[in-house]
A protein has these predicted regions:
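Beta-rich, blade/repeat-based domains predominating
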Residues: 1-10, 39-53, 82-94
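Conserved beta-strand positions in repeat-built beta-propeller and related beta-rich domains
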Residues: 7-18, 54-59, 98-102
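Surface-exposed loop/turn positions within WD40 beta-propeller blades
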Residues: 18, 28, 51, 60-61, ...
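A short loop-to-beta-strand structural motif that recurs across blades of beta-propeller domains
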Residues: 19-23, 62-66, 105-107
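Short loop/turn segments that connect beta-strands within beta-propeller blades
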Residues: 25-29, 68-72, 110-111
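A short beta-strand motif characteristic of beta-propeller blades
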Residues: 30-36, 73-78
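Conserved active-site loop/cleft motifs that coordinate metal ions or position small ligands
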Residues: 55-57, 66, 76-78, 89-90, ...
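Blade-level signature of beta-propeller repeat domains, shared across WD40, Kelch, NHL, RCC1
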Residues: 83-111
Length: 111
């Protein structure tokens, strides 16, 4: 995998409900995509932490997803606050911060 500075991560929102996490490598022009787990995933925000794990908010499962690009696996962290509706993800070393627009709370995930 190329150096993290040369990778662009994004989430694809679509009316066809084919939401996916995507990676673009400008040096090669290559796109890769991974469908979020679940029957009808609704991905929204994306954040890459300092260990190169990719965090994605997922509305249908009411969870934060952590994607490992090396194993290409998602890990889900379910919300205990109901429908969190995370629209942004912020972080600092060892933490991911998720402001929940539906609950007016900030949830911190430590790893």
């Amino acid at each position: 995998m190329p150096a993290r500075e040369s990778i662009i991560w994004n989430v694809n929102l679509s009316i066809e409900k084919r939401e996916a996490l995507s990676r673009y490598e400008p040096a090669t022009g290559k796109w890769s995509a991974w469908r979020a787990p679940g029957d009808e995933p609704r991905v929204y925000a994306v954040y890459v932490d300092e260990t190169d794990k990719v965090w994605v908010s997922e509305w249908t499962a009411q969870a934060m997803l952590r994607f490992d690009p090396k194993t290409e696996k998602f890990e889900a962290f379910r919300s205990s606050t109901g429908r969190p509706n995370v629209r942004q993800i912020h972080g600092r070393k060892g933490e991911v911060w998720t402001p929940e627009s539906a609950t007016d709370k900030i949830v911190v995930y430590r790893y």
